[in-house]
UniProtKB/Swiss-Prot annotation:
Disulfide bonds: C29-C51, C35-C56, C39-C58
Family: Belongs to the short scorpion toxin superfamily. Potassium channel inhibitor family. Alpha-KTx 02 subfamily.
Role according to the record: Blocks voltage-gated potassium channels.
PROSITE patterns xrefs: SCORP_SHORT_TOXIN
Record-given protein name: Toxin Ct28
Alphabetical UniProt keywords: Amidation, Disulfide bond, Ion channel impairing toxin, Neurotoxin, Potassium channel impairing toxin, Secreted, Signal, Toxin, Voltage-gated potassium channel impairing toxin
Gene source species: Centruroides tecomanus
Tissue specificity note: Expressed by the venom gland.
Record flagged with keyword Signal: yes
Length: 62
């Protein structure tokens, strides 16, 4: 049973690192719409974008 919990914790940590694939780029923004094109240029058509603290944050969803 201890081995099961150990494997479960390892899988949890691995999934957290996979979900956190984001990059902050040096593009100023006030809305996510301003970030979408630069992020798509960087990661391709499946990229996601957010505007956080006046900078664009890109997510690789592909």
């Amino acid at each position: 049973m201890k081995a099961f919990y150990g494997i479960l914790i390892i899988l949890l940590f691995c999934s957290m690192f996979k979900l956190n694939e984001s990059t902050t780029i040096n593009v100023k923004c006030t809305s996510p719409k301003q970030c979408l094109k630069p992020c798509k240029d960087l990661y391709g058509p499946h990229a996601g974008a957010k505007c956080m603290n006046g900078k664009c944050k890109c997510y690789n969803n592909g």
